[in-house]
C-alpha cells in the first residue's frame, strides 16, 4: 500500500487535514446562526484545550510552544551504590566541576543535572549540620562556664566543713600522743628525779658513790648486750619511751639508776681537761684488747668518730641504755655483794677512762 500521495504528503497527514477541514466547515455552519461571532481555527483549538489543561500550561505553551511544556518529574530514588559513589566524591570535594559531574553521572547511570542538584542539597545539609554542632559547642561552653562559676563559689563551704573534722582529728591524735607521752614522762621523771637528788648528795659523799659503783659494775655486761640488741630506730625519744619493763626496775633501784648521770659528769670533766691540754691524737686503727672485768659505762662496741659524739646524743644513748635495762638484770646486779674497796674502784675508774679515751682517739691522761 502506498503511503505517500501527491507532493510527498502521507495519507495520514491527508486524513488529518481533511478531518480538520470538516470540523472547520461544521463550525462555520454553526456560526451562521450567530452572525456577530465568527470563531477562528486558533480560538477553537484553545477552547478544546481548555477542558484538560490549566491556565499556566496554556501560557507556557503560548510562550515556548508545545515542546517546552513543563513536565512534572517524579522524585529520584537513589540506590545504595549511587549514594556511596556520591558520598565518596563529596568527601573529596564539595564543589565538583563539570568534568567530575559528568564522570560521576556516567558511573552512577544518572543524568548530570541530577548529580548537580544532589551536590547542592548535600552542601545545604552539611552547612545545617555544622550550624547545629556550633550551637551545641556554644551551649556546652556556657554550661561549663556556669558550672565553674558555681564551683568557685561552692567549694569554700565544703572546705570549711572538711577542715573541721581534720582539725578534730589532729586535735584528737595529739591528745592521744600527749597522754602517752605524759605517762612515759611521768615514769621517766620519777626515775630521773631520784638520780638527780642522789647526784647532789654524791658530790657531798663521794665515798658512798664509789662503793655504789663497785656494786653496780657486774651488771654492765648485760646492759651492753641489751644496747647491741636495740634497733637504731629506738633511739628516738618517742619510741624509746615505750619500755614497760624498765620502768618498774628503775623505780625499785634508785642507787643503780644514778650511775649514768654521775659518770656523764665525770666524762664531761675528762673532756674539758683533754681540751685544755690540746693533745688530740687520731689513731688510724685501734685494736681492742680483752675487756676487763669492769668495762666503762656507756662504752659502745661500734666506734664512732669524735665529731659525732655530742653531749645530747650521748645523753640520749645513756637514757636509752638506762630504759633498755630489764628488771631481772637489775635485781641480779643489786643483789651482788660489794667486794672491792675504795682504792680498787678509783683505779678501775682510771683504767676505764684510759680505755675510753683510746677508743675516742684521745691521748691518755698523764699519770
UniProtKB/Swiss-Prot annotation:
Pfam families: Homeodomain, OAR
Keywords: Developmental protein, DNA-binding, Homeobox, Nucleus, Repressor, Transcription, Transcription regulation
Record protein name field: Diencephalon/mesencephalon homeobox protein 1
Gene3D superfamilies assigned to the protein according to its UniProt record, in alphabetical order: Homeodomain-like
GO molecular function: DNA-binding transcription factor activity, RNA polymerase II-specific; RNA polymerase II transcription regulatory region sequence-specific DNA binding
OAR, short sequence motif: residues: 344-357
Tissue specificity annotation: In the embryo, expressed in the developing central nervous system and in other tissues including the developing digestive system. At 9.7 dpc, expression is restricted to the midbrain and pretectum.
Described function: Functions as a transcriptional repressor. Required for brain development.
Sequence segments annotated as region (Disordered): 129-254
Composition bias, Polar residues: 159-192, 233-254
Entry GO CC: nucleus
Species in which this protein is naturally found: Gallus gallus
UniProt DNA-binding region: 71-130
Intracellular or extracellular location(s): Nucleus
Protein family (similarity comment): Belongs to the paired homeobox family.
PANTHER family: DIENCEPHALON/MESENCEPHALON HOMEOBOX PROTEIN 1, DIENCEPHALON_MESENCEPHALON HOMEOBOX PROTEIN 1
Predominant localisation class: nucleus
Keyword Transcription: yes
GO BP of this protein: regulation of transcription by RNA polymerase II
Amino acid at each position: 500500500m502506498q503511503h505517500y500521495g501527491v507532493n510527498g504528503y502521507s495519507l495520514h497527514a491527508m486524513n488529518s487535514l481533511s478531518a480538520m477541514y470538516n470540523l472547520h466547515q461544521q463550525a462555520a455552519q454553526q456560526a451562521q446562526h450567530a452572525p456577530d461571532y465568527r470563531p477562528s481555527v486558533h480560538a477553537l483549538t484553545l477552547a478544546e484545550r481548555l477542558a484538560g489543561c490549566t491556565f499556566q500550561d496554556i501560557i507556557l505553551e503560548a510562550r515556548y510552544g508545545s515542546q517546552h511544556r513543563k513536565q512534572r518529574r517524579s522524585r529520584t530514588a537513589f540506590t545504595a551504590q549511587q549514594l556511596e559513589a556520591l558520598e565518596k566524591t563529596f568527601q573529596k570535594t564539595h564543589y565538583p566541576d563539570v568534568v567530575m559531574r559528568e564522570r560521576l553521572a556516567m558511573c552512577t547511570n544518572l543524568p548530570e543535572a541530577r548529580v548537580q542538584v544532589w551536590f547542592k542539597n548535600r552542601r545545604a545539609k552539611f552547612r545545617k549540620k555544622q550550624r547545629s554542632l556550633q550551637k551545641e559547642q556554644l551551649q556546652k561552653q556556657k554550661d561549663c562556664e556556669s558550672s565553674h562559676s558555681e564551683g568557685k563559689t561552692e567549694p569554700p563551704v565544703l572546705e570549711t566543713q572538711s577542715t573541721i573534722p581534720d582539725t578534730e582529728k589532729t586535735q584528737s591524735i595529739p591528745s592521744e600522743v600527749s597522754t602517752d607521752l605524759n605517762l612515759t614522762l611521768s615514769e621517766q621523771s620519777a626515775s630521773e628525779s631520784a638520780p638527780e637528788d642522789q647526784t647532789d648528795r654524791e658530790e657531798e659523799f663521794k665515798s658512798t658513790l664509789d662503793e655504789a659503783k663497785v656494786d653496780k659494775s657486774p651488771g654492765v655486761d648485760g646492759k651492753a648486750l641489751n644496747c647491741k640488741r636495740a634497733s637504731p630506730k629506738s633511739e628516738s625519744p618517742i619510741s624509746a619511751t615505750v619500755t614497760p619493763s624498765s620502768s618498774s626496775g628503775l623505780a625499785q633501784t634508785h642507787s643503780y639508776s644514778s650511775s649514768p648521770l654521775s659518770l656523764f659528769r665525770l666524762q664531761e670533766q675528762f673532756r674539758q681537761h683533754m681540751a685544755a691540754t690540746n693533745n688530740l691524737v687520731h689513731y688510724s686503727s685501734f685494736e681492742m684488747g680483752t675487756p676487763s672485768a669492769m668495762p666503762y659505762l656507756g662504752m659502745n662496741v661500734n666506734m664512732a668518730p669524735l665529731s659525732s659524739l655530742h653531749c645530747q646524743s650521748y645523753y640520749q644513748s645513756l637514757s636509752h641504755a638506762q630504759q633498755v635495762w630489764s628488771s631481772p638484770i637489775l635485781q641480779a646486779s643489786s643483789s651482788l655483794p660489794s667486794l672491792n674497796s675504795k682504792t680498787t674502784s678509783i683505779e678501775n675508774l682510771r683504767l676505764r677512762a684510759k680505755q675510753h679515751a683510746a677508743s675516742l682517739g684521745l691521748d691518755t691522761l698523764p699519770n
